[in-house]
Amino acid sequence: MHIDTRYVTRYNINMIKSFAHKGLKEFYESGSKKGIQPEHAPKLGRMLDRLDASTSPQDMNLPGYRLHPLKGDKQDMWAVTVNGNWRLTFYFEGQDAYLVDYQDYH
């Protein structure tokens, strides 16, 4: 069978490519709250859905998320506020998010 590629639609899907936090990855993939603060689950779910659909850090600049770049040895990374001192951190390479982490870094 031969497919004429002139008529094939190609999709370039941007997405979260990697996680630094095992519990966050499990929450994202299965909904399990065992590796995260359970009270953060609703907001984390919204943030991860948004991040998965984002093509740049600026797509995460929503009211209440407090998007900000990190400094020092993490200068290529960005953070959004989950609750209190808890942050969702990530960096973009091209239009994909990498090393998505969930941490209390203050």
Regions found by a protein language model. Give the residues of each.
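A short, surface-exposed loop/turn module that caps and links secondary-structure elements
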Residues: 55-78
